[in-house]
């Protein structure tokens, strides 16, 4: 299966609110028809207030996230200050575009979640064609098709962290109900003025305990 085909069978979800941005990703890692592990962390901490969620083959996603993280750290060491979220997204998009033009594209789709003191929560959606857009909410993969209507219905920029987490739980529950793919576990992280925080994993047991 091609790398972009693999990314479509994975899922990324994101919500941007006034004081934070929350993203979730499935934790399934497969090779052909074999499940390698179901606790993969696809949400990578790039800096103190920046998370990057990536879909694609394990090699591409890990290598690209580390490439971005190390270059951002190098920039901070050289210049004495770090890049803001918009600048990191611009750097990421340029590298995706350069790879695409070179004939050896980086086959990853991603969500970039960040927090800036002036802008508040920020969410960007990027794909392997280097298309980039700032969005209030986003979803990648076939599973995301079941979630866009839920996000559109319940999204508000004034949501609190518990409320946004509940919206993501609704999305995951619909994925479990409607999608034939096995995506049982979703990791969730939130970035705010306090930094990056990991929230409880959303899985089938979450909904059993909620009853």
What kind of feature is each model-predicted range?
Residues 1-211:
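Long, low-complexity N-terminal extensions
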